[in-house]
């Protein structure tokens, strides 16, 4: 099977969409020989910060000498990013071979799997074939009925920041959403949580008590920021000092979650030296999360796509670029709460460019442009995200800031274009 045929299989029309329930993925994995049963997991659910926390933990575990799988979604530039071993995305030939093994199993099923279930099963088989010591597994959506929840009790279950997103599927209160996410908490695991709101904290404590699961919550008060700038930050947590290249105060809280997860894993006998923890955090890379792509003019890429992310992004712009003229390059999905996102960001914007993310769920740039006019600032409409980025750069003074925000589906196109441009101009 070629990589093209493999992608055709994965993106096949028969299994579009998201249909909650674990029966299909269970059957598919069983037909594959249950590869997940031979793996150890750190399972991560939450609204925001899942990917960043997963990247930190994978980096730390790798630095500690473990062969580490990482499963995340969505991808930015290439599908292969969704499954990595030791920081390297799945090679085309290996992914094609895994998909070839899937094909007869799918054909034998009466109820065909969804695309996400296929990708999850493919990843499990690949991680098993690669002999991973541990897999850092990010939930796709929710937790309880997510395809990743097919695993037995993980070494550690992590709940990152919980907010309102995907309310049409997960429920429209924080308590309902917390119950869905807490579906990954299985007897026999240890749980670690982000510093949550009181109603979320109450749900997690109740469920962990019912299931006999030890729960640790990261302590925001134990984080002491030391230095902070566009190249990264240093901080102490519970007295130990760390360097983190990811920007924003929220990343310090995500790092605290990763550090508490290390403590939970050590309690289960995992050998993770302090030096590996420091090196893992210092080396972590997680693109399109308030990522600085250019200087003079400054170009920041932030894939945040809900009101909570937008508030964080606005705070980061104020923190790192006070007093500068900021153009917001915005692209959103029509089913997101973009009015609340834009209300949170508007205080930082001098001008707007509206673009259309590369997704069938995208809000067309022209419609977004009309909406943005209510803020009374200059609005330009340029549907193609990469062209919109070029336009913004062409009109910016060296000290100005452009921040592309609103959707990971837009971030990938812009990142690819700007990096290609940079490589061409620098002779790489």
Indicate residue ranges for each PLM-predicted region.
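Nucleotide phosphate-binding/pyrophosphate-handling subdomain across enzymes
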Residues: 38, 134-137, 145-158, 162-163, ...
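Acidic, Mg2+-coordinating active-site environments of NTP-dependent enzymes
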Residues: 110-111, 118, 131-138, 154-241, ...
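Short, high-confidence coil segments that cap the C-terminus of an alpha-helix
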Residues: 131-133, 323, 397-399
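Active-site-proximal loop/hinge segments that shape catalytic or ion-binding/gating pockets
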Residues: 407
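Beta-strand->loop->alpha-helix junctions that form or flank phosphate-binding loops
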Residues: 74, 194-195, 207-229, 245-249, ...
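ATP-dependent carboxylate-amine ligase catalytic core
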Residues: 18, 22, 26-37, 63-152, ...
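N-terminal leader/targeting and accessory segments in enzymes
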Residues: 1-48, 52-67, 76-78, 190-193, ...
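C-terminal helical cap/extension that packs against the catalytic core
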Residues: 194-216, 230-232, 298-301, 307, ...
């Amino acid at each position: 099977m070629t990589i093209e045929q493999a992608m055709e299989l994965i993106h096949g029309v028969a299994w579009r969409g998201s249909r909650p329930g674990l029966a299909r993925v269970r059957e598919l994995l069983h037909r594959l020989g249950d590869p997940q049963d031979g793996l150890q997991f750190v399972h991560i659910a939450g609204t925001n910060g899942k990917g960043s926390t997963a990247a930190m933990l994978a980096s730390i575990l790798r630095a500690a000498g473990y062969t580490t799988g990482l499963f995340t979604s969505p991808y930015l530039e290439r599908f292969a990013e969704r499954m990595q071993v030791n920081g390297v995305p799945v090679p085309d030939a290996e992914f094609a071979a895994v998909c070839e093994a899937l094909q007869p199993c799918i054909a034998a099923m009466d109820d065909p799997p969804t695309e996400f279930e296929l990708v999850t099963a493919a990843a499990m088989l690949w991680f098993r074939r690669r002999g991973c010591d541990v897999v850092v597994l990010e939930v796709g959506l929710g937790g309880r009925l997510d395809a990743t929840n097919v695993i037995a009790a993980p070494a550690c279950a992590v709940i990152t920041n919980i907010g309102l997103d995907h309310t049409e599927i997960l429920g429209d209160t924080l308590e309902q959403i917390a119950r869905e996410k807490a579906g990954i908490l299985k007897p026999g695991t240890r749980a670690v949580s982000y510093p949550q709101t009181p109603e979320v904290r109450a749900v997690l404590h109740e469920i962990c008590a019912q299931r006999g699961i030890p729960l640790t919550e990261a302590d925001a008060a134990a984080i002491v920021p030391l230095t902070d700038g566009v190249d990264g930050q240093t901080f102490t947590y519970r007295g130990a000092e760390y360097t983190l290249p990811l920007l924003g105060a929220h990343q310090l809280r995500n790092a605290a979650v990763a550090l508490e997860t290390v403590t939970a894993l050590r309690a289960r006998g995992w050998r993770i030296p302090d030096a590996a923890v420091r090196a893992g955090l210092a080396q972590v890379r997680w693109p399109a999360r308030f990522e600085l792509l250019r200087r003079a003019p400054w170009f920041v890429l932030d894939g945040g796509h809900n009101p909570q992310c937008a508030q964080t992004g606005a705070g980061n712009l104020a923190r790192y670029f006070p007093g500068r003229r900021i153009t917001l390059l915005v692209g959103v999905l029509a089913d997101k709460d973009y009015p609340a996102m834009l209300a949170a960001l508007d205080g930082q914007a001098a001008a707007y460019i509206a673009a259309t993310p590369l997704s069938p769920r995208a809000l067309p740039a022209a419609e977004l442009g009309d909406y943005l006019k209510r803020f009374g600032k200059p609005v330009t409409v340029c549907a193609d995200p990469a062209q919109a980025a070029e336009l913004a750069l062409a009109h910016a003074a060296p000290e100005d800031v452009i921040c592309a925000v609103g959707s990971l589906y837009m971030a990938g196109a812009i990142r690819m274009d700007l990096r290609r441009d940079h490589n061409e101009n620098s002779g790489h």
